[in-house]
Curated annotation (Swiss-Prot):
It is found in: Host rough endoplasmic reticulum membrane; Host membrane, Host caveola; Secreted. Homotetramer. Interacts with the immature particle in the viroplasm. Interacts with host CAV1, early and late in infection. Interacts with host integrin ITGA1/ITGB1 heterodimer. Interacts with host integrin ITGA2/ITGB1 heterodimer. Interaction with microtubules blocks trafficking to the Golgi apparatus. GO terms for biological process: monoatomic ion transmembrane transport; symbiont-mediated activation of host autophagy; viral process. Belongs to the rotavirus NSP4 family. It comes from Rotavirus C (strain RVC/Pig/United States/Cowden/1980). InterPro entries: Rotavirus_NSP4. Residues 31-150 are cytoplasmic. Glycans are attached at N5. This is Non-structural glycoprotein 4. Plays an essential role in the virus replication cycle by acting as a viroporin. Creates a pore in the host endoplasmic reticulum and as a consequence releases Ca(2+) in the cytoplasm of infected cell. In turn, high levels of cytoplasmic calcium trigger membrane trafficking and transport of viral ER-associated proteins to viroplasms, sites of viral genome replication and immature particle assembly. The keyword Iron-sulfur does not apply.
Length: 150
């Protein structure tokens, strides 16, 4: 059966069978359409259609025989997909953990930065008050006439 399959259903033989009607058509045109050549051309065209149909039927038969193997393939494919989904879940979890960690670090750095900014403003305000109190003349603010001011 394999020999017949290789002989009649190979791409090489189909290519040769496809060229025969064209060659016979040229011969028919040169011989003014002999009935024998027309009959041979018809037989070859029918044989070609039969071979193509047979090849299709054999292909369908092979597919039907492989359905038992196909169930195993479906289970293997399902397991493979589930394995990939588990791996993906691990990667996504790691990604979210990394994002969460980065977010927490950023929040901590922001709060530290704000605290330092507040401290700097407070120290600046204290320094301004000290400078302002040092510049103030006690005689101008008290309204008292003391020996120091005179």
């Amino acid at each position: 059966m394999e020999f017949i399959n290789q002989t009649f259903f190979s791409d090489y033989s189909e290519g040769k069978i496809d060229t025969i009607p064209y060659a016979l058509g040229i011969v028919l045109a040169l011989t003014n359409g002999s009935r024998i050549l027309k009959f041979i051309n018809l037989l070859i065209s029918l044989l070609r259609k039969f071979i193509i149909t047979s090849k299709t039927v054999i292909g369908k038969f092979k597919i039907e025989n492989n359905t038992s193997h196909q169930n195993d393939d479906i289970h293997k494919e399902y397991e493979e997909v589930m394995k990939q989904m588990r791996e993906m879940r691990v990667h996504v979890t790691a990604l979210f953990d990394s994002i969460h960690k980065d977010n927490m670090e950023w929040r901590m750095s922001e709060s530290i930065r704000r605290e330092k900014k507040r401290e700097m403003k407070a120290s600046t305000a204290e320094n301004e008050v000290k400078i302002h109190t040092n510049d103030v003349n006690i005689c101008d603010t008290s309204g008292l006439e003391t020996e120091v001011c005179l």
